[in-house]
């Protein structure tokens, strides 16, 4: 591995002891350092952090359409990392019955449509609680976000039908 730091952090260390005292098996790997350095350059050159904030706001706005689904209990997140919580009852936030394995059904149906989701069950005290995460690429376009939401809407309709909603 390598440590990637801003110029401010580097200058602070350089003005002090000049030593960054840390060690791991792969510390100081020149390839890892070069990759980290290039990644930071690309983030800066492409203004990708600001872009992620802007596109994250757009994603959040488009995700709001999913609140019309009877099983969508909450939508939350920051930037391009967004999560959707699925519930049996929107008012009480009672989780879906774990025996439904909703998160597995959601994952499989999404894959059939070419949509990659991170889904999980047992999010509430390790027993119940189904959720999914979206984390599109930093370079995602508005049209792609719209396509993702359209596919996700179709997937949810299909899975809701399978479980009787």
Residue ranges of model-derived segments:
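Conserved N-terminal phosphate-binding loop of PLP-dependent enzymes in the Aspartate aminotransferase
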Residues: 1-165
């Amino acid at each position: 591995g390598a440590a990637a730091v801003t110029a401010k952090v580097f200058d602070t260390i350089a003005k002090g002891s000049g030593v960054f005292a840390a060690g791991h098996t792969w510390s100081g790997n020149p390839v890892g350092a070069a990759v980290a350095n290039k990644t930071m350059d690309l983030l800066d050159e492409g203004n990708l952090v600001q872009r992620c904030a802007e596109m994250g706001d757009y994603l959040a706005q488009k995700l709001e359409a999913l609140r019309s689904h009877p099983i969508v209990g909450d939508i939350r997140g920051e930037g391009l990392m967004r999560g959707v919580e699925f519930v049996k009852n929107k008012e009480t936030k009672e989780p879906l019955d774990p025996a439904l394995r909703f998160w597995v059904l959601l994952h499989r149906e999404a894959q059939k449509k070419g949509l990659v989701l991170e889904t999980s069950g047992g999010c509430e005290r390790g027993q119940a609680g189904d959720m999914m995460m979206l984390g599109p690429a930093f370079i995602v376009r508005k049209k792609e976000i719209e396509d993702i939401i359209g596919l996700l809407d179709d997937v949810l309709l299909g899975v809701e039908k399978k479980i009787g909603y």
